[in-house]
Amino acid sequence: MALPCSFSVALVLLSCHSLCCLACHLPDTHSLRNWRVLTLLGQMRRLSASSCDHYTTDFAFPKELFDGQRLQEAQALSVVHVMTQKVFHLFCTNTSSAPWNMTLLEELCSGLSEQLDDLDACPLQEAGLAETPLMHEDSTLRTYFQRISLYLQDRNHSPCAWEMVRAEIGRSFFSLTILQERVRRRK
C-alpha cells in the first residue's frame, strides 16, 4: 500500500512543479556546451590579430539584449535561441571559403547543433513567450548578423575577415553564456 501512496505523492509533486515552473529548464550539459563552444572558437584562431589590423571593424554588438536584469526568462531564452541559430548558420553553412581546421569546425557545429536541439525541445509557448513578443530583439540580432555577413562578403571571405568574425562571435557568445548563467542563477 505504501508504493501507490508514494507514487501519488510523486505525481502531485511533478504536477505542482510543472504548473509552478512554466519556464524551460535546459539540461546542465547545455551550459557546459556553451563553454566548449567558446573553447573551440578560441582554438580555431589561425591568424594573429595584429596581422589583420587593417580588417578591424565595429559590428555594433547589441549589448543591451544581453542584460540579464532587463530580460524575463522567456525573453532571454528567445535571445539565446536566435543567437545560437545565427552562429550555427554563420559557421556551419558558410564553410566553403572559411580557413578553419575542419576537425574543430565539425566539433563546433556538432556542439551548436546539440544546443539547438536542447532549445528546440523547449517550446517557447511553454516558456511564457506567447505573451512576450520579441520583434525588437529578433530584428536587432538579425541586423547584427547581417552586418557580419556583409562584412565577410565585402572582404571576399578572406582569412583575415573570418578571423575578425571569429573573434567577434567569441565575444558575443561569451555574453550569451553569461546571460544564460544569470538567468539560471535567478531560478
Swiss-Prot record:
Disulfide bond entries: C24-C122, C52-C160
Lineage, opening ranks: Eukaryota, Metazoa, Chordata, Craniata, Vertebrata
BP term (GO), one: defense response to virus
Domain of life: Eukaryota
Keyword Secreted: yes
Organism for this UniProt entry: Canis lupus familiaris
Main location: secreted
Subcellular location: Secreted
Record's protein name: Interferon alpha-3
